[in-house]
């Protein structure tokens, strides 16, 4: 894992939290504010469970993070031009693999990430149509603040995260560079085949709702 990637994961483990959206009756900023507090409350409420069973953090991650990220779009963006060079089944397994990569990393760092002071700046539209940038300043006592941006866009279920930008550096661009190097070294098909999730025996795909399922337990 690159140092840039590690920085993103440490800074954003909690902040890439759930976006409990009531359709689009809430603004993007209101959604981030409410859901961030919900995660803080959940970690406090479940402190005993987390201390006795650290793996319980994966339950929280699955419940509060996964449903509110557009992993299909993120996977497409992070692979870039290679996305259209792999077939649909490979696209599906890559989505699972990329999602699970993030889930595992979040679970690793969640337990020790607390005592944050979170402030918000005015939300701005992004260059891409329909995308809104939610801005946070995150400070821990005695440390310099970090500036974090959440590019989010609406779908039928509310606002969905499509990237994370910390101090001006995009998470997707960081992973894109890492994956590009691996593809250059071993080739696209070998890179895809190296992903555990791409060894599934059966993959089912509902293109209408982006419901992705396999016979394997990926977590």
PLM segments and residue spans:
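Bacterial N-terminal signal peptides that target proteins for export
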Residues: 1-8
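Surface-exposed, polar/charged faces of alpha-helical domains
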Residues: 45-48, 52, 88-89, 115, ...
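Bacterial N-terminal signal peptides
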Residues: 8-18
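Short beta-strand edge/turn micro-motifs at domain boundaries
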Residues: 147-173
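Sec/Tat signal peptide C-region and signal peptidase I cleavage site
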Residues: 19-24
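Surface-exposed, charged secondary-structure patches
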Residues: 104-146, 198-219
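Early exported N-terminus immediately downstream of N-terminal targeting peptides
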Residues: 25-106
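Low-complexity, intrinsically disordered terminal/linker segments enriched in charged
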Residues: 163-219
